[in-house]
Amino acid sequence: MAKEIKDNRILSVIHPICCGLDVHKGKISACLITTDNAGKEQYEIREVGTFTDELTELREWLLANNCPIVAMESTGIYWRPVHNILEGYLEVILVNARHVKNVPGRKTDIEDSRWLAGLLRVGLVRGSFIPEKEIRHWRELGRSRKKYSQSLGDYKRRVHKVFETANIKIDTVVSDLFGVTGRNLIELLCTEEAEISIEKIEQCAKGSLRSKVAELHRSIQGFFEEHHRFLIMSLMRMIAIIETEMALISERMKGLMRSYEETLERLDAVPGINEVSAQYVLSELGPTLKDFANSGALASWAGLCPGNNESAGKRKSGKSPVRKHVLKAIMIEIAWAAVKTKRTYYRDKYYRLRSRLGPRKAIVAIAHRILKALFAIIKHGESYRELGEDYLTNKNKKSRVSILRKQAKKLGYDLVPATPT
């Protein structure tokens, strides 16, 4: 007869030796947990600084105690110096601070490290995605370019503002003030102090704007004084600097991603994606997606899928989590570009969803679908296949006909197929 054995342990120990780190800018509290032969845990606390030599001492202490794994909160960028020292020597688990909150009333640095170590010991922490070093370099370049792009937009808006205050209305005639014609006119305004003749306007106008020379001439008749000239020249110099830096970063990224040109080309074939956004996507995800089991896991990580919120058997609001995720912002931009591309599946699907969900939820749904396609392209090497704007119409034709028959019957009519002529 089998003998019943009572197990008094509430949770199984996953990591008998582990460490929790409470990381700050200038100080780290470390709690090392070890387990003796009797299965009893022992705690050792240390506080160290964040200079490289101090972090190296921390690493050597952990290795001397045969610690294979550490956990720390993703506090700003303060975890990066620690990760730089420990990477390649120990397994580093980066956890979301919201997921490992300590018990109220026990909030000290040492207690936080002990709490984190305790959670790690029994496997109650979930690590964040930390890409490889090469991919992290791509990320930093891509995010720097994104910041430059945002700054560029700010400076361009300031140019528009200065022109508006000076009664200069070029942007009412020219769709892009910073296109060839627009820049020519800006340069003309900044270099010509005398009254500008219509002949000089003709020299500035390019393409279809040559037929609007008279309107362009009227648009610059304002109160453009030396004060406005100085401001515009200052702003244009900053715009030129930012554009140069963005071009240098793009070339740098292109060189680093040269081994993955084929993947970038396949990404570029997706509606809404160009060369730059393809680089953004690859820099955020990496070229293998080995850390994501399926497209659903990727969408969840990016904050582009509904959350689970169920209580007492009832499903409550499952809206996407409010998360400032870089990839989510990129995918939303791609989705907007995709739905503006005519005769595509995404455009048709967006307008179908918008009538039911509204524009904001609909665009998130499109971003989710595009991300699933990108998963297949990157991980499985598949090529994008455009379904076309009639895909859903043809797919739902039978059900649509059935609905129309019922509607016609209610109105006292019979729906019959059209006779071929």
Enumerate the language-model features and the residues they cover.
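A detector of single, family-specific signature residues
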Residues: 1-421
